[in-house]
Swiss-Prot record:
Claim: Cytoplasm is one of the keywords in the record: yes
Protein name per Swiss-Prot or TrEMBL: Glutamate 5-kinase
Binding annotation for substrate: S50, D137, N149
Places the protein is found: Cytoplasm
All residue ranges annotated as the PUA domain in the record: 275-353
Lineage summary: Bacteria, Pseudomonadati, Pseudomonadota, Gammaproteobacteria, Enterobacterales
Gene Ontology molecular function, alphabetical: ATP binding; glutamate 5-kinase activity; RNA binding
């Protein structure tokens, strides 16, 4: 083995269940064995696990419940304890302790909470404890959810300062087309940047048991790679897949990390789930993308959502394309009032000002 590395392994519901209605315990045993082997070799392992809802449904005998958020939260509340108990039992075979971390979007949006979560995660790793991370589905609503465990795993990789992020799924990797419907589809082995062509290939394929598809894995890979973290999408059923990834063997689709990764603050900006969205005109779009300029109120066309000053927001062009994320200097109500106006008018409109820009270029990451 090479020098010690930190690996985040994301296990989707389809991997943990094998596509069935219940957890595939035999397969989970094998995944734990692979992780334990790496742990014994001195590597640091973080697991982002799906499956709480599936575990809850299995434990309750597959009840017929309405398809509502409340039903999912009920199943998650039951399943989270069952799932963590399973991880604890299996890792204890190898004398490895685990620590559970349940996160929501609020833990990522607020810079102080982000740093607290980072410190907690790294403390677990420093003490040779394997963190088991999941979104807190039992309490999270649409407004506070990260949305899927693919993006959560990218955030976990940033928090952990990971070297690699492994997204295990029921597919071999990213293909040129959907291999389930197109026999001519070819595996894409290496990716050096996520673009619109790749996003189009990924489409909206979603497993019936989980909340993530290939498109969310692409989002996660983009976030992680821009933070300097190699990301691999591979099949969870491939024998020895976790060890192969740590050895650097060719497996699945590898997204190569950017040579010049983002600084820590900008990693947070890029990774934090946006609290709201603003649409900007063509002039502002060109200024941001071509000249690296700050966003002035004059260029804002509309504001969506309710957010506070200091929260991360999404900046979109008039075609709806996500062009940047940044920290807003004003709250959503204030931005609605000053949108389309010159910076010199801010004080007259609001009765105060926090400077002439809506989002400063130092607090902005282009997509």
């Amino acid at each position: 083995m090479s020098d010690s590395q930190t690996l985040v392994v994301k296990l989707g519901t389809s991997v943990l269940t094998g596509g069935s209605r219940r957890l595939n315990r035999a397969h989970i045993v094998e995944l734990v064995r692979q992780c334990a082997q790496l742990h014994a070799a001195g590597h640091r392992i973080v697991i982002v696990t799906s499956g709480a809802i599936a575990a809850g449904r299995e434990h309750l005998g597959y009840p017929e419940l309405p398809v509502t958020i409340a039903s999912k939260q009920l199943l998650a509340a039951v399943g989270q304890s069952r799932l963590i108990q399973l991880w604890e039992q299996l890792f204890s075979i190898y004398g490895i302790h685990i620590g559970q971390m349940l996160l929501t979007r609020a833990d990522m949006e607020d810079r102080e909470r982000f740093l607290n979560a980072r410190d907690m995660l790294r403390a677990l790793l420093d003490n040779h404890i394997v963190p088991i991370i999941n979104e807190n589905d039992a309490v999270a609503t649409v407004e506070i959810k990260v949305g899927d465990n693919d993006n959560l795993s990218a955030l976990a990789a940033i928090l952990a300062g990971a070297d690699k992020l492994l997204l295990l799924t029921d597919q071999q990797g990213l293909f040129t087309a959907d291999p389930r419907s197109n026999p001519q589809a070819e595996l894409i082995k290496d990716v050096y940047g996520v673009d619109d062509a790749l996003r189009s290939i990924a489409g909206d394929s979603v497993s019936g048991l989980g909340t993530g598809g290939m498109s969310t894995k692409l989002q996660a890979a983009d976030v992680a790679c821009r933070a300097g973290i190699d990301t691999i999408i591979a099949s969870g059923s491939k024998p020895g897949v976790i060890g192969d990834v740590m050895e650097g063997n060719s497996v699945g689709t590898r997204f190569h990390a950017q040579a010049s990764p983002l600084e820590n603050r900008k990693r947070w900006i890029f990774g934090a789930p946006p609290a709201g969205e603003i649409t900007v005109d063509e002039g502002a779009t060109a200024a941001i993308l071509e000249r690296g300029s700050s966003l002035l109120p004059k260029g804002i066309k509309s504001v969506t959502g309710n957010f506070s000053r200091g929260e991360v927001i999404r900046i979109c062009n008039q075609q709806g394309r996500d062009i940047a994320h940044g920290v807003s200097r004003y709250n959503s109500d204030a931005l609605r009032r000053i949108a389309g106006h010159h910076s010199q008018q801010i004080d007259a409109i609001l009765g105060y000002e926090y400077g002439p820009v809506a989002v400063h270029r130092d607090d902005m990451i282009t997509r």
